[in-house]
Amino acid sequence: WGRTRIGLHSGRVIAGNVGGSGRQKYTALGDVVNTTARIESLNKQLGTRMLASAETVASAQSAQKWRSVGKFQLVGKAEGLEVFEAVGDDADPDELALFQQCLETCHSDVCVAEGMVRDYVQRYGEHKILSMHLRQAIRGEDSDVIILKKK
């Protein structure tokens, strides 16, 4: 069995019955639907289970804890979108803090970031998200937006 992955995004959609007299289907259409699907798909690349756009996290009135995993230019999009990962109530606050420090440092000081990520890995194990950001910084890419090539 596979693992369920969830992507969350907010906005207006067109929803209703679509199709002809012989076959109708209730569905939602629009950019928000496509962006949500891309966010859900991003889970697989990052090794996460639940991701949400910054817009959704900001508008949700929930006790759910979230951590930023960075900005991503989703396939078919021109701009980067900040994405957040859902974390459990039992998440280690020290791990969360070091993760955020590593993420921020990857885009400001690659030499310091390498040491910080190494420290993170020794304490908590390998992390796909940090590895992705660090690789981009090492390649010398100026942007803090990771450009995704596949859905």
Region locations from a protein language model:
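A short glycine-enriched loop-to-beta-strand structural element that forms part of the catalytic core
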Residues: 1-16
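Short acidic, glycine/proline-rich loop/turn micro-motifs
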Residues: 17-22
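Allosteric regulatory "coupling" segments in signal-transduction proteins
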Residues: 24-29, 69-72
